[in-house]
Amino acid sequence: MLVISNLFKKSSKSRKVRCEICANYCKIADGAYGICKQHKNINGELFDESFGIVSSLNADPIEKKPLYHFLPGTLTYSVGGFGCNMGCLHCQNYMISKEFDKISDRLNILPETIVENAISQGCKSIAWTYNEPTIHLPFNKKTSLLGRRKNLKIIYVSNGYMSSQALSEILEFVDAFNICLLYTSPSPRDGATS
C-alpha cells in the first residue's frame, strides 16, 4: 500500500525530494529509493511503500527486547518490518534489513489486526523491533495510537538514527525505548555504511 510521507522537502529546482525521516536525509531522485529502500520519490512526492507489510509477528517476553524494568514479566507483541537506514556488517537480522527483496514471505496486515492480536495473546505492549522501526513511521504511528486507546504500551527498539522531526512524532506515542548503540564516531555518516 502506498502512503505519502509527511516528512520530506521538495526541491525547488528539480523533482528530487529530501527525506526527513532519519538522519541520513536522503536526497532521492524521481523514481528512486532512499537508503532504507522503503521510501520512493514518485513525481516529487515521497511515498512509503511498506505500509502494512511486516516480516515478523511474535508474542515475546518483554525481557527479550531487552527491557528489564518496564512491565517486567509480561508479554509484548513484537512487530518487525523490512529495511534499515544503516548498513552494519554485524547485523543479526540482515535478511529482513538488507536482503529482503529475496524474501517472498511477506505479511500484509492492518493496524487494527496487530492491536487485536496483541490483546488476544495476552500482551501488555507492542514492540517495534527486529529492523529499524523509524523507517515505518506512518504505519507504526497509526497502529500505536490505536493500541494506546486499548491500554497497550508502545516500545521502540531502535538504532536511534532518526531526524528530530521523526523523534517529535515518535514521542507522541512511545512509552519505552531501547536504543541499540551500534557505533560511535565523530563523523555522523561513519556509522551508516550503506
Q: What residue spans do the PLM features occupy?
A:
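Disulfide-bonded cysteines in secreted/extracellular proteins and peptides
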Residues: C19-C22, C26, C36, C84, ...
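Conserved small/polar residues in nucleotide/adenosyl-binding loops
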Residues: Y183-D190
